[in-house]
Amino acid sequence: MEDENTTIIMASLSALSPSHLTNLTHSILSISHHHRRRLGAVLSSPTLFSLTLRHLLSLSLPDKTHLIANHLLSLLHPLLIHRKHHSSYAVTMKLRDLDAVVLLLFLCETHQLHPDVLEASADNWREILGNTYSNNMLSNNSGLWTCDAGILMPYIETLVRCKRFVDIMGGYNHLRRRDQKEGYQVPAARAAVVALRAVEVFNVAASNAGEVECVICKEEMSEGRDVCEMPCQHFFHWKCILPWLSKKNTCPFCRFQLPTDDVFSEIQRLWEILVKSSELHVA
């Protein structure tokens, strides 16, 4: 599964133009620096480490899953920001949650590479993890981070690990919700609805070479009135589309998906876009 996810991401990156790849690399470098600074701050402060670890240990497994899912969503955002008609909105995490997730991921990485390290008393974890972090930083400063591969590969590895965890934990719970209610739908994100364009019917008819019908109510759109234009360039009465989008994030005509505030559905939406872009590149 990890190899498949890595292949999808790499194929999607290969489809980018040089300028888009450069912009993406700069964005990822900025994000990575921010995450490393937060992890360094947690490990260097006894008080902050204690508070962050306590917060992390207080979270249930579903809460940890949601935490990692939000982190994954924030990592996916830079990959989609340049894609036309496929908008995504940057995820803003509380500082306490960001500190918790970067510490959690570092604990998992440390346990995977050095299983015996965390068998020590938790009172010694900050010192042990701090030394491990310092050694990693010294290794990274050898020049690896000056090339695109050195910036992208750690990002891809983190993204794939988070995706795998969410697929196992969050995906299972998400499928259960779908099974509980056939035809399960999620509403469109409020920000996505607010961003929809208002277009005059005269201009709509001109661009479509004739009269336009709202497929929700099956009535023609009155000339001179403002109607809603979806990113897929389909048009609807505002009074029809707003109730629709309060329940479903899809276009009534073509099933184009708007962003949603449901974290697991949004991950699935963005991942499907990446899969399609990778398939087009391979084809």
Swiss-Prot record:
InterPro entries: Znf_RING (IPR001841), Znf_RING/FYVE/PHD (IPR013083)
One Gene Ontology term, aspect cellular component: amyloplast
Gene3D superfamilies recorded: Zinc/RING finger domain, C3HC4 (zinc finger) (3.30.40.10)
Protein modification: Auto-ubiquitinated as part of the enzymatic reaction.
UniProt keyword annotation of DNA-binding present: no
Pathway: Protein modification; protein ubiquitination
Outcome of gene disruption: Reduced gravitropism, altered amyloplasts sedimentation but increased amyloplasts saltatory movement. Abnormal interactions between amyloplasts and actin filaments (AFs) in endodermal cells.
Keywords: Amyloplast, Metal-binding, Plastid, Transferase, Transit peptide, Ubl conjugation, Zinc, Zinc-finger
GO biological process, one term: protein ubiquitination
Gene Ontology terms for molecular function: ubiquitin-protein transferase activity; zinc ion binding
PANTHER family per record: E3 UBIQUITIN-PROTEIN LIGASE PRAJA, E3 UBIQUITIN-PROTEIN LIGASE SGR9, AMYLOPLASTIC
Protein's name according to its UniProt entry: E3 ubiquitin-protein ligase SGR9, amyloplastic
